[in-house]
Amino acid sequence: MGLPWYRVHTVVLNDPGRLLSVHIMHTALVAGWAGSMALYELAVFDPSDPVLDPMWRQGMFVIPFMTRLGITNSWGGWNITGGTITNPGLWSYEGVAGAHIVFSGLCFLAAIWHWVYWDLEIFCDERTGKPSLDLPKIFGIHLFLSGVACFGFGAFHVTGLYGPGIWVSDPYGLTGKVQPVNPAWGVEGFDPFVPGGIASHHIAAGTLGILAGLFHLSVRPPQRLYKGLRMGNIETVLSSSIAAVFFAAFVVAGTMWYGSATTPIELFGPTRYQWDQGYFQQEIYRRVSAGLAENQSLSDAWSKIPEKLAFYDYIGNNPAKGGLFRAGSMDNGDGIAVGWLGHPVFRNKEGRELFVRRMPTFFETFPVVLVDGDGIVRADVPFRRAESKYSVEQVGVTVEFYGGELNGVSYSDPATVKKYARRAQLGEIFELDRATLKSDGVFRSSPRGWFTFGHASFALLFFFGHIWHGARTLFRDVFAGIDPDLDAQVEFGAFQKLGDPTTKRQAV
């Protein structure tokens, strides 16, 4: 039968064996992609500098997901935190990738088997001898099994009872490591940034899923509900499954973009809101102030700031700075970070400390403006020199570095001062290597941005798919143009499965 491309899925209508086959093949493709992508990323990943060139700067997409579940070692002899290891064990990055590829191959073979041997006794209704599926019972089985998996993940893997735990870090992404997590059963478990909520919610949701699965296995739906929701139609299953998937996609798009315990910044990069709110800048200033309160010099206080913390406070790591259609990793944009030059402190000729106004997220260019502690503009880099009153030359601005590679170095010549003022707009100043990757200097987004964009886009698409298939299954008789109580042959829409005379609509 000459099916148009958009109707090819009708071949698995009323064919449970081949419906199962195509789903197994889909699982094979997903697992095969995951394993292959992991091997590709491992081939190009450079683990040598986890501070200034972490996985998210290199555009790694699947490695962060493996890492947050407890995989940290490679058969290449390296650890994700920068150390070396001698016995990575089976469950290394390569081991997980290989397991996915082996699983993919087995699913591929199983899909072929089920395609060839499609007419199995298990799919036949013993009363009619025709293929049929007990969809409410299948729903109960799936709910029960997914509940067991959910409960097992929360109770064993996350807690470390049987498993490694998950990636846990401090609020500033400095001390992250894989460790067991105790369930948080109090109100704190509802805080999206508390790792204990991951364990407790999986245990609770898994328990609910197990109980709900047993309920649906032991209780039949009422006839009115069964007919009203078209529970005997496979397209109802499709519609409700799409609903579950698009809802999950919207949720994870949110937890990724806004940040949560499930998306640590060490693995996925910072969020845009941490730049917008000066999150890392405030912590850096708090640490410097604490150092000064302990009678440390300004130089010593800034020298104690971890390079990792300073690097987060750089606009090039903001996922909202990269355009959605700029291909490549962050390293392909502004370059590979080599070192922190230090914190520049600007002063005018009266000795008043000046602060460069930082570039907001959605600006490509921004005027260089220096304000004092009260927010009053004291200096700038003017667009029109003839009308300038606050130029660096007129105000006599100097810059001195504290911490980093230029610790203790000061500059007073206007050209150099303006250069560092422009760079200070972008947060802490880093030396960036653009030669190695031929980086073009245009900011890129991090995997956090790609994941969010992809999942939000597909969630919207799947939302419309849910509406489409839900409407089709609920109003099938209307769309087919057939009175459900009519069993006479009708030309238009007579066959549920196109070209198949065995599926002529019967009166119920």
Swiss-Prot record:
The record's listing under InterPro entries reads:
PS_antenna-like, PS_II_antenna-like_sf, PSII_PsbB
Q: Where are the transmembrane segments?
A: 21-36, 101-115, 140-156, 203-218, 237-252, 457-472
Task: Give the subcellular location.
Answer: Plastid, Chloroplast thylakoid membrane
Please state the protein's primary subcellular location: plastid
One GO cellular component this record assigns the protein to is: chloroplast thylakoid membrane
Q: Which UniProt keywords apply?
A: Chlorophyll, Chloroplast, Chromophore, Membrane, Photosynthesis, Photosystem II, Plastid, Thylakoid, Transmembrane, Transmembrane helix
Topology within the bilayer: Multi-pass membrane protein
> MF terms per GO, please?
chlorophyll binding; electron transporter, transferring electrons within the cyclic electron transport pathway of photosynthesis activity
Question: What is written in the cofactor note of this entry?
Answer: Binds multiple chlorophylls. PSII binds additional chlorophylls, carotenoids and specific lipids.
Biological process (GO) annotations?
Answer: photosynthetic electron transport in photosystem II
User: Would you identify the family this protein belongs to, as annotated?
Assistant: Belongs to the PsbB/PsbC family. PsbB subfamily.
Q: Which purpose does this protein serve, as stated in its record?
A: One of the components of the core complex of photosystem II (PSII). It binds chlorophyll and helps catalyze the primary light-induced photochemical processes of PSII. PSII is a light-driven water:plastoquinone oxidoreductase, using light energy to abstract electrons from H(2)O, generating O(2) and a proton gradient subsequently used for ATP formation.
Kindly state the subunit structure of this protein. PSII is composed of 1 copy each of membrane proteins PsbA, PsbB, PsbC, PsbD, PsbE, PsbF, PsbH, PsbI, PsbJ, PsbK, PsbL, PsbM, PsbT, PsbX, PsbY, PsbZ, Psb30/Ycf12, at least 3 peripheral proteins of the oxygen-evolving complex and a large number of cofactors. It forms dimeric complexes.
What's the protein here called? Photosystem II CP47 reaction center protein
Q: Which gene specifies this protein's sequence?
A: psbB
